[in-house]
Amino acid sequence: SLMVIAPAHHRRIQAGILSWGQDMDQQHNPFQCNLGYQVSLSGKGEWNKTADYVGKAALEKMKEELKAGKKPYKLQLVGMELGGKPIDNYAPDFWLVSPESGGDPVGFLTSPWWHPEKKTNIAMGYVPFDGTLNANGFPKGKVGTKYKVHLPEQYSETPGTPVDAVVVDIPFKESFNANTREVVK
């Protein structure tokens, strides 16, 4: 018998729904993977959660460092639109991201896929955190920052040549009914 078990991969990525083990794991903190609004902590974006919870002291310290303009971690999850041939299969490994000018990799893609409505590849991935915060003080990627992505040959326009990529907001497309994450971004 056939039954639906999950959203289509491009819809998951489009909505910014994270996959445990692919987009985040126990080595990531909530701020790093765009879940800071969950820490805030009614989930509405304010910084006044009074209840105690595991890791509260570390997250409160990180919150203060972010507010002070410090960078308590190196990589931030971002959305990207990128070139190349349509990505139509799951990435068996992370694909490297380099600065626009080239050079050594500085990050990696976690979830790439072809977006049929946008007619381009979209992806979530980690790039250097530059300290950009949204209006509510939560970390985010700097929209418009350009990178190069090293795709496997099957998706590369020219084998061995990285494709252009640009940081965009997550979710990639606004929801019909905005959720808390979209409201506080």
Can you say where each PLM-predicted feature lies in the sequence?
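Conserved, structured C-terminal
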Residues: S1-K185
